[in-house]
């Protein structure tokens, strides 16, 4: 089972396409949707929704996959549920990058302060990160520097921030899920 978390653009047709591509790894791909506008509510909703879906899961190794803002949540929700995560162009600092896009981006900083201290250290090797060298939204070099002490970093030379084509990375994602 794969839980897919969309980015800030929840209605993008690319979400359906990415879910279809992920079905080459596991036919059971589930969209876990969230508002993107209310961080504290989103966190509660995502925790509850993943817990509910896990009740009906017979997969010994379910996987969280998120893109952009969805990768921010995949890392945290995956950690809190003991799941591996694939972070695609993760938005590591939405309290900064979401300024002017949502009402209270400072809620992300509050969430970070309330999270388990040094959660990445405790989550080492339980996530892999796929970064685009041509991400037009986020600084992928800074993201790599922040995450490389904890997670494997895979680079893509052609995809943009929304990462429409996962095909080149599906074998690595599958190996990570099963490994």
UniProtKB/Swiss-Prot annotation:
Signal peptide: none annotated. The lineage of its organism: Bacteria, Pseudomonadati, Pseudomonadota, Gammaproteobacteria, Alteromonadales. Transmembrane segments: none annotated. PANTHER family: ESTERASE YQIA-RELATED (PTHR35602), UPF0227 PROTEIN YCFP (PTHR35602:SF2). InterPro entries: AB_hydrolase_fold, UPF0227, UPF0227/Esterase_YqiA. NCBIfam families: PRK04940.1 (NF003431). Pfam families: UPF0227. Belongs to the UPF0227 family. This is UPF0227 protein Shewmr4_1727. HAMAP family: UPF0227. It comes from Shewanella sp. (strain MR-4).
């Amino acid at each position: 089972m794969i839980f897919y978390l969309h980015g800030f653009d929840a209605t993008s047709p690319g979400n359906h396409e990415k879910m279809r591509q992920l079905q080459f790894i596991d036919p059971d791909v589930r969209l876990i949707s969230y508002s993107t506008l209310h961080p504290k509510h989103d966190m509660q909703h995502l925790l509850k929704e993943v817990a509910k879906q896990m009740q009906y899961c017979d997969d010994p190794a379910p996987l969280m996959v998120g893109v952009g803002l969805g990768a921010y949540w995949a890392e945290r929700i995956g950690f809190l549920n003991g799941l591996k995560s694939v972070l695609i162009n993760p938005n590591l600092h939405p309290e900064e990058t979401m300024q002017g896009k949502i009402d209270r981006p400072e809620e992300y900083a509050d969430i970070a302060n309330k999270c388990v201290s040094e959660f990445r250290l405790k989550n080492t090797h339980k996530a892999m990160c796929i970064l685009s060298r041509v991400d037009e939204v986020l600084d992928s070099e800074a993201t790599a520097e922040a995450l490389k002490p904890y997670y494997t970093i895979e680079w893509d030379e052609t995809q943009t921030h929304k990462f429409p084509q996962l095909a080149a990375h599906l074998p690595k994602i599958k190996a990570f899920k099963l490994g």
